[in-house]
Amino acid sequence: MSDYDVIIIGTGAGGGTLARHLAPSGKRILLLERGGWLAREPQNWSTADVFIDGRYISPDTWYDAKGKTFQPQVHYFVGGATKLYGAALYRLREKDFGELKYPDGISPAWPIGYDDMEPYYTMAEGHYQVRGARGEDPTEPPSSAPYPFPALPHEPRIQQLSDDLAAAGLHPFHAPCGVLRDEDTPQTSVCVRCGFCDGFPCPLHAKADAEVMGVRPALESPNVTLLTEAPAIRLSTNPDGTAVTGVMFEREGSTETVTGDVVVVSCGAANSAKLLLASANDKHPNGLANGSDQVGRNYMFHYSQAVLALSKEPNPTVFQKTLGVNDFYFGD
């Protein structure tokens, strides 16, 4: 008999959400998290501590293809990278799942389409209590349900910017936000519309991150166990190499192994690939799930561009991440 019915490696957006969904099943579930709990402390909202001193960045050293070291600036905590995310929760568009042509090459179509994912988007928006408004963004894909909560109102300067963009022929909209804000009774709201939502931890637990909305609700079920400071280092398989049966991990200076009927690898794009490659055996000499020899290759990081503007007028906005524009989503 296995130690657990399900072992989930990683407690971020994937693992934390899955744990919450599986918890009511009564199955014996183990969560393995390489990090610990992110402390609720005054430094959470300190620009100097967060961005200059890198208080919450892992000291990991990684190596590029030429062996040169670099610091990836990743975060390892219960809740994963969502502990410092901006809580903007968008859906991919239908076209994103198809073949896309770029100057550097072709991105092949996914084996699934948007329609396959739509019910899960709706479920996730409920789990993460997303605030938004359907119908404002002309690029948004079809949905089977409205957002679970109304959109967050813009502050005056952001509203003026929205109006100006609309006057210029664009289609600004209220960004879908995962924050626990009650505009009807702000005096009892968990979210206080602070100026530190994007890129900072939330000491109020008002951000809908994977710890607050996933792991903590899951741990209310007695069948769910969480081990922190427990990085997975290798997956074991059955003798035929047809199924993963266990996980080797480090904790408190020693190495332990647990077995599970189902093992979920949800420790981020890079670290999931690393774990699969590190689990090579005689049946899988190139690493698990790597018959294509593509695991760990072709990684595309979260790509973004920034536009900065200087204003002659003061901008008193505090809670500013409520506005979105997708008119140029596909570069048209």
Regions found by a protein language model. Give the residues of each.
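Glycine-rich loop(s) and the adjacent beta-strand/alpha-helix scaffold that form part
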Residues: 24, 35-40, 44-45, 221, ...
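Conserved redox-cofactor binding core of oxidoreductases
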Residues: 65, 101-232
